[in-house]
């Protein structure tokens, strides 16, 4: 192994790599890129709460917009409210419920909802073709015999103890 006592010096000449290949690839990339198109009409959702609307438990017209048919508070995703607005709406709804401006549940719509869900659950079901294998039938009949024999023995014991 060769080791020199002299320190390593970098060469003064710089390495020039041809930049031509890089430029070519950049040009082909630009060809495929589509220009950015600005939409013709700016699309912006209007907020459900206007600047003049006051979030208060007495403002029933505003509060009713944020309650579902069953009387539940709608989520932020559905309401499109900010976190602060949602918090204020929730507090206002809860205050209105406590002060009995609002019902805790909307029973009329809830009954309709329950009736629909029950009809979906208990609707006509296809009957299952129950086939019990013969071994299981035999086992069940033997078990029934054993149970009846056991009850007869118990009855006989009770009768003999009474005498």
Swiss-Prot record:
Sequence repeats lie at residues 4-10, 11-17, 18-24, 25-31, 32-38, 39-45. Keywords: Chloroplast, Plastid, Repeat, Ribonucleoprotein, Ribosomal protein, RNA-binding, rRNA-binding. One of its GO terms (biological process) is translation. Residues 1-54, 121-163 are annotated as: Disordered. Pfam families: Ribosomal_S18. Part of the 30S ribosomal subunit. This is Small ribosomal subunit protein bS18c. The gene is rps18.
């Amino acid at each position: 192994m060769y080791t020199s006592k002299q320190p390593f010096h970098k060469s003064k000449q710089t390495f020039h790599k041809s930049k031509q290949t890089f430029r070519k690839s950049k040009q082909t990339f630009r060809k495929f890129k589509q220009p950015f198109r600005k939409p013709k009409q700016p699309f912006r959702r209007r907020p459900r709460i206007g600047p003049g609307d006051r979030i208060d438990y007495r403002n029933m017209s505003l509060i009713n917009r944020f309650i579902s048919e069953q009387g539940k508070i709608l989520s932020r995703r559905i309401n499109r409210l900010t976190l602060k607005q949602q918090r204020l709406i929730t507090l206002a709804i809860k205050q209105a419920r406590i002060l009995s401006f609002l019902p805790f549940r909307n029973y009329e719509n809830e009954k309709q909802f329950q009736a629909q869900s029950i009809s979906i659950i208990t609707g006509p079901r296809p009957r299952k073709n129950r086939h019990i294998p013969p071994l299981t039938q035999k086992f069940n009949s033997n078990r029934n015999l054993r149970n009846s024999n056991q009850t007869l023995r118990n009855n006989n014991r009770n009768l003999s103890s009474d005498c």
